[in-house]
Amino acid sequence: MIQSAKELLKKGAAELGVQLDAAQLESLNLFAEELKKWNRKINLTAITGDEEIALKHLVDSLSLLKAVRGPGRLLDIGSGGGFPCIPVKIVQPDLEMVSVDAVVKKISFQKQAVRLLNLTGFTALHVRAETLAQEYAASFDWVVSRAFSDIPSFVAMALPVLKPEGRIVAMKGRSAAEEVEGAKDKLDALGAGVLEVMDFTLPGTGDARSLVVIGRN
């Protein structure tokens, strides 16, 4: 990435309370370059400019660390081009990651990025999330996604693979208060409830973001 994008990445992460060291910055930069290279051949993301990638993919992914900290096991459902799981893994290597997406080319990219970055404790799977319960029942401390539009559907998919005291984190691209209120009865029926809603502004953009943290009742 160009120097201004690297500076935005470092500054944006710091505003979220994440201090990136030189090695982490270099790994995030390598990941961004690999994303751009693959994106010229296959459609991984509509966000292609360096500064946009730095803020709307990398810093946005790292915002998950407001709610999640290692060690532990984390499942990212609908991870696409590796967001938020790969940036979070770079910064929190003690999180064991499983990343799933239904699009094979996106998982192929993730596997290549993981090899390039020498990340260990990271499994990328081309499966539908609905099929995970058999192999991964009650396996994860955190189940996260920034892909779901509907919180109850995400929670229903996450609960079978969540440890009893585990947490579900829905990353929302706007203030989530209204959606959370509307989902309350459906979550209650699933035996789950919202524990916390963390509203914030994505650094460098002015865009509203929310992390909705959910647990079992």
UniProtKB/Swiss-Prot annotation:
Molecular-function GO term, any one: rRNA (guanine-N7-)-methyltransferase activity
Pfam families, alphabetized: GidB
InterPro entries on file: rRNA_ssu_MeTfrase_G, SAM-dependent_MTases_sf
Tagged with keyword Methyltransferase: yes
Predominant subcellular localization, coarse grouping: cytoplasm
Principal EC category: transferase
GO cellular component terms given for this protein: cytosol
Keyword S-adenosyl-L-methionine among UniProt keywords: yes
Keywords: Cytoplasm, Methyltransferase, rRNA processing, S-adenosyl-L-methionine, Transferase
Residues annotated to bind S-adenosyl-L-methionine: G78, F83, A129, E130, R146
Catalytic activity: guanosine(527) in 16S rRNA + S-adenosyl-L-methionine = N(7)-methylguanosine(527) in 16S rRNA + S-adenosyl-L-homocysteine
Family statement drawn from the similarity comment of this UniProt entry: Belongs to the methyltransferase superfamily. RNA methyltransferase RsmG family.
Function: Specifically methylates the N7 position of guanine in position 527 of 16S rRNA.
Protein name: Ribosomal RNA small subunit methyltransferase G
Organism: Geobacter sp. (strain M21)
